Structure formats: structure tokens, C-alpha cells
Amino acid sequence: MPTLVLIRHGQSAWNLENRFTGWWDVNLTDQGIAEAKAAGELMAAKGLDFDQCYTSFQTRAIKTLNIALEAMGRLWLPVEKDWRLNERHYGGLTGLNKAETAARHGDAQVKVWRRSFDIPPPVLEPGGEFDLSKDRRYAGIAIPSTESLKDTIARVLPYWEERIAPDLKAGKRVVISAHGNSLRALVKHLSHIPDDEITELEIPTGQPIVYELADDLTARDRYYLSER
């Protein structure tokens, strides 16, 4: 029976500052580092082990994975990084404080941008502070100017089918360290959560989510490791 573990990165600097982060690269806070270490220690204590690891191109997810693996004595495990596991791109909201954005645009509009399934935020204007077009890690990639959750799912699921699902079907134990919305995409797919419900699903930082899967990758169980 294949085992899959999902971990949202530990608290980041912009989580702490309540800013829209998206594709912008920010580091973990001390609390985020502690969350990642605790996740690794918990997985080791519960007897979890892995054969293959996946993460995004973003530092906060990569570091969370590395810190957790170090706590498990598994830094040597193979890791594949891919931009398709990145956080949802928040477009022109990137870098803005969420409370200030609500004061400027109104709570209702900000809720639409944050929590609707298929309505993206305003686009990120090219050439600005948060333009990633010259970031070498994204060379050859068509960087989005904004994304809805639906857009995020549209890039995450092909990667799942192409790379991750075959590993699980081959019997490999897999851990994915990623982001709130890229993980929502996977949870929606695996647990068949409707469009209007997935936007309300909260995924806390640094908490391993365990999926016990049938051989055809249908979900038999989903739970937070800390609760079992």
C-alpha cells in the first residue's frame, strides 16, 4: 500500500508579516525552522521512511524538506525539485500586507482574490520589484503573471501524473514539501474535494499530512501525523 506524506513549508518571514508571498522567495523564520525539525522528528518517531522526495523551486519548501530529512537521518535521499510545485502566483498582490490590501480594496474583493476557485488577482506588472523574469532558476519557463487556484491545479496535476504517481505505483514511499495552494491541488485531487470547498481547506505550516493509498492511488485514509 503506497504511502504519501505532504508537508507545507514551515513558517516563512512573510507568513509572519502577513504578506502575499506567491512565487517570491523568502526564508524560514526561527519558528519555521523549528516546525521543520519537529516534523522530521515526528516522522522518525512514527516510523515513517521514504524512497523519493519532491519539492518546489522555492527556498522555504526546500529548506523545510532538508531540515526534516536531517532530523530523520535521511539527507541522502534523492530529491527532485520542480517549479510546478511552487506556490500559487499572487500576481500584483505579491509583497502586499493582507490587512493593508483589504483596507485599500475592501474585504470582499480581497476574499474573492484569495478564496475564489477560478478568479485570479490582478496581474504582476513586468519590470517591477517582484518580476522574476531574470531569475536564473526560471530560465525557459513561462512565468505566470497571476494565478487562481484553478490555474495552480492545472500545472500541479500534470506533474503529479508524470513524475509522482508513477513512483507511488512502483511502491516507493514519497514525501512532498511544498506550499499551501500546490498542496491544496493534490488534496483536492486525491480526496475528491469540490471546487467550492477546497478554497476553505486550511493546511497548517510544518504539519505532515499522511495519505494511505490503494495500489490504484485512491485514498484510503488522510490524517495529520500528529493526531495518530
Swiss-Prot record:
Example of a GO biological process term: glycolytic process
Homology family: Belongs to the phosphoglycerate mutase family. BPG-dependent PGAM subfamily.
Annotated catalytic residues: H9, E87
Annotated site (Transition state stabilizer): H179
Binding site for substrate: 8-15, 21-22, 60, 87-90, 98, 114-115, 180-181
Function: Catalyzes the interconversion of 2-phosphoglycerate and 3-phosphoglycerate.
Enzyme Commission code: 5.4.2.11
Keywords: Gluconeogenesis, Glycolysis, Isomerase
SUPFAM superfamilies: Phosphoglycerate mutase-like (SSF53254)
Superkingdom per UniProt: Bacteria
Pathway: Carbohydrate degradation; glycolysis; pyruvate from D-glyceraldehyde 3-phosphate: step 3/5
Name of the top EC class for this enzyme: isomerase
Keyword Phosphoprotein appears in the UniProt entry: no
Catalytic activity: (2R)-2-phosphoglycerate = (2R)-3-phosphoglycerate
Name of the protein described by the UniProt record: 2,3-bisphosphoglycerate-dependent phosphoglycerate mutase
Cysteine pairs bridged by disulfides in the record: none
Organism of provenance: Rhizorhabdus wittichii (strain DSM 6014 / CCUG 31198 / JCM 15750 / NBRC 105917 / EY 4224 / RW1)
MF term (GO), any: phosphoglycerate mutase activity
Gene: gpmA
Subunit annotation: Homodimer.
Listed HAMAP family: PGAM_GpmA
